[in-house]
Amino acid sequence: MPMYLRQLMEAYIRQKRASPGMVQASDLQINRPMSGMRSNSRELHAYDGPMQFMSSPQNPDQILTHNSSATSHISGNNLISVGGAGSRNNSNNLRTLSTISQEADLIEEISSHELEDEESSPVPMQEQQKPLPLSANSTRPRTRQQSFSDTLDEDDYANRNIAAAAPVRPAGMAASPYKEANLEGSNGTANGGESEGDVIGNIDQFVMQPAPQGVLYKCRITRDRKGMDRGLFPIYYLHLERDYGKKIFLLGGRKRKKSKTSNYIVSCDPTDLSRQADGFCGKLRSNVFGTSFTVFDNGNKDSTESPRLDLAVIIYDTNILGFKGPRNMTVILPGMTEDDQRVKISSADPKQQGILDLWKLKNMDNIVELHNKTPVWNDETQSYVLNFHGRVTQASVKNFQLVHDSDPEYIVMQFGRTSEDVFTMDYRYPLCAMQAFAIALSSFDGKIACE
């Protein structure tokens, strides 16, 4: 680059630095020893080192006498000079309009051709760059993620917390539409019009009553591993969560001894978990392989006045090849009437078919079919994930969300682990506490053909 072009470019850069649009650090001090002490009166320049000689008045190659600390403003025929902190003689800053105009045109022409080079261009001060995060393949330890390595069970998978939903009544519940105007919200919580449920009336009646529309019941299940027979049959307790850590007992369940298949007794009396107890609410029974579970109420299958009713059927997909991954489950419920009550279906009644038989025959008029929401594979955590919105904190193969195919964003029920023996269980319409608790109990039971 010719010498005069380089000098003009330096003058252009000095003028640009002194303009109001640029902010220049005037109080930046470099910590270096200077005769054993720091001088607060040391004059600071734009260039420090060999480049400082370029801005010196004694520079033999200096052509322009323009002071870099002054900025000229042209307003009509008047010339206004604004002196900077390093200006000593403002009279040297005044020049004719023609000279400034010619220099500006020449500088603009030079800058348009991008004639800067590394020697003449000022080197700006740069902040120290932060190290980039290591890639997923690096060995740098990450913060704890919900993945298979963090599981408590060897076949657990990761998850997240409750996807939001504007409820839509699924097929089989189309008798009355949802009050969508009162249930709109981005997270399905009370902020969007949905309220948290509370116990109304007696416990034994409440646990059998379907959840009202627009109400979310947040519950917690605790597992007592001591249970019965030295821990062979744990006891499970369901509580409704209240504010400030309070809770209300709803149901208790345990596995029956001396039963050919898995058989759970559910009662609203925590002190007496037996079929003969006054608080007996129903039972959960599985097939031999543990792939199908049926939920019954407390009725008598041999009674004609109060026959035993089917409350739900839970079917787990078989996994004969033993592939690891989340479970796939199907839940069939009785349909809902116009007044939001369950359709009475009894497999004990020889005059009608049970829920499982209706589902096998594809007779969906009086039943509702739900499925677990398919988790999404996360490449970063190398795990399957679901959005539980803070309600689930640990990975487990037992974590699931139940949805209807017509509206996958309406979470009918969700269940997941928060600690080794504590789980959260949230449910909505059309489930009742008995149905939701029985579905959760089925996830605890061992499944020969599903693991």
From Swiss-Prot:
Where is there biased composition of kind Polar residues?
A: 135-150
Principal localization? cytoplasm
Localization of this protein: Cytoplasm; Nucleus; Cell projection, Cilium membrane; Cell projection, Rhabdomere
Q: Where is this region: Disordered?
A: 113-152
**Which residues are recorded as modified (Phosphoserine)?**
147
Mind telling me which InterPro entries this protein's record contains?
Answer: Tubby-like_C (IPR025659), Tubby_C (IPR000007), Tubby_C_CS (IPR018066)
Please report which protein family the annotation says this sequence is part of.
Belongs to the TUB family.
Stated name of the protein:
Protein king tubby
Q: What gene codes for this chain?
A: king-tubby
